[in-house]
Amino acid sequence: MIKGIQITQAANDNLLNSFWLLDSEKGEARCLAAKAEFVEDQIVAVSELGQIEYRELPVDVAPTIKVEGGQHLNVNVLRRETLEDAVNNPEKYPQLTIRVSGYAVRFNSLTPEQQRDVITRTFTQSL
């Protein structure tokens, strides 16, 4: 179980009023804020804190979700003719924005090679 604490008394003055997350299952403490000696996100064994007194703080721990091997899909709703016309007449499409690898990008800002690649990948005859 993880609990948040503020150290109120300690033999080490650098620990006074510092904030930590204590993981009782692992016997570890993660520094959230300290005057000196410890840095943010540093993990130490609870025993390294020495003799301390503390007050507990409310902590809302959100569950960590790990997704491995997922898939990614970019959706561009347009016609092939529109992109081909934008390659030949970029001045007609200054605001044409497409999705590439999760990012929105102006089609005209792509190199000619990248534009051809987008057209090839977006419009296929079969899967």
From Swiss-Prot:
A GO CC term attached to the entry: cytosol
Molecular function terms, GO-annotated: formate C-acetyltransferase activity
Domain of life assignment: Bacteria
PROSITE patterns xrefs: GLY_RADICAL_1 (PS00850), GLY_RADICAL_2 (PS51149)
Pfam families listed in its UniProt record: Gly_radical
All residue ranges annotated as the Glycine radical domain in the record: 5-127
Xref: InterPro entries: Auton_GlycylRad_Cofactor (IPR050244), Form_AcTrfase_GR_CS (IPR019777), Gly_radical (IPR001150), Glycyl_radical_cofactor_GrcA (IPR011140)
Keywords per UniProt: Organic radical
Residue numbers bearing the Glycine radical modification: 102
Function in brief: Acts as a radical domain for damaged PFL and possibly other radical proteins.
HAMAP family tied to this protein: GrcA
PANTHER family (alphabetical): FORMATE ACETYLTRANSFERASE, FORMATE ACETYLTRANSFERASE 1
Protein's recorded name: Autonomous glycyl radical cofactor
Organism name: Histophilus somni (strain 2336) (Haemophilus somnus)
